[in-house]
Design a protein with these regions (language model features):
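Nucleotide/phosphate-binding catalytic cleft detector across ATP-hydrolyzing
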Residues: 1-38, 42, 47-141, 158-165, ...
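Basic (Lys/Arg-enriched) interaction patch that binds polyanionic ligands
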Residues: 141-144, 149-154
Length: 278
């Protein structure tokens, strides 16, 4: 099912409002999606209408360049999210959808969820998850995460090309740490609350990302470019990409941090309809 901006914009707002808060009341069947990111782990629950009803988020350094390097830490976070959600809803989540960066082994994400006590109902790469949610035509999807940037080309709702580049929010933090002479951990915290202030220092990194995207989408004949991922929430990113790609319609939804988790949870709802919390 195709979803336009009127469909997902309020859902992203709802996800942001519910993040680590009391879940929304619902009697609907519920589906769980787990996004294992470089800087965060997000578990999102959606109802039959694809509306987020609960969101758990932990900032965590458990994934680097698309690889789970702290397996125990990742499992611990997912298990904690699962325990929280099951206690809040009084239901058992036996299945969840998840994703992986293009070009990496999906078994990495699957193993984390299985070790946390979940069966994986559906798995797909990150930009494909967003592309499936939007059901685009002649468009590119750029998912700028913490450690990687996923790029997908979509024609008539089908992903015809995907790639992953080892650049993302982690590299922004490295640049900021060097610029301000602070630790990487301090830089991670600082960038979340000082977006306008840090833009001059980190803009060159985003310019490099845009150059990388340009190489991947060259000659693909797309008309629209959709940006997703938490690293896109930096003020200045949308304007930079619009200047880099003046011939394209560049879209950046608010609260893009939750776009991939919403896409993952929605894929579980649409592709594994009978596997919901009971």
């Amino acid at each position: 099912m195709a979803h336009d901006e009127q469909w997902f914009t309020p859902r992203l707002q709802t996800a942001a409002t519910l993040c680590n808060q009391t879940p929304a009341a619902t009697e609907s069947p519920l589906w769980l999606g787990v996004d294992l990111g470089t800087c965060d782990v997000v578990s999102m629950v959606v109802d039959r209408d694809g509306q987020p009803v609960a969101v758990c988020l932990d900032w965590a350094d458990v994934v680097r360049d698309g690889i789970v390097w702290d397996f125990f830490g990742a499992v611990t976070i997912v298990r904690r999210h699962l325990d929280t959600l099951e206690q809040q809803f009084g239901l058992r989540f036996s299945h969840a959808a998840t994703s992986f960066p293009p070009g990496t082994d999906p078994r990495i994400s699957i193993n984390v969820l299985e070790s946390a006590g979940l069966e994986v109902s559906h798995v797909l790469d990150e930009p494909t998850a967003v592309a499936d949610l939007l059901q685009l035509d002649n468009a590119g999807v750029v998912d700028i995460g913490g450690g990687t940037t996923g790029i997908a080309i979509v024609k008539k709702g089908k992903v015809t090309y995907s790639a992953d580049e080892a650049t993302g929010g982690h590299h922004i933090s490295l640049t900021l740490a060097g610029n301000r002479r602070i630790s990487l951990e301090e830089a991670e915290q600082y960038k979340r609350g000082h977006g306008d202030e840090i833009w001059p220092a980190v803009k060159p990194v985003y310019e490099k990302m845009a150059d990388i995207v340009a190489r991947h989408i060259e000659g693909q004949g797309i008309t629209d470019l959709w940006l997703a991922g938490g690293s896109c929430m930096q003020p200045g990113v949308a304007e930079l990409f619009r200047k880099q790609f003046p011939a394209l319609q560049v879209h950046l939804p608010q609260h893009s941090l939750f776009m991939t988790p919403l896409a993952i949870a929605s894929s579980g709802r649409e592709k594994a309809e009978g596997l919901y919390a009971k």
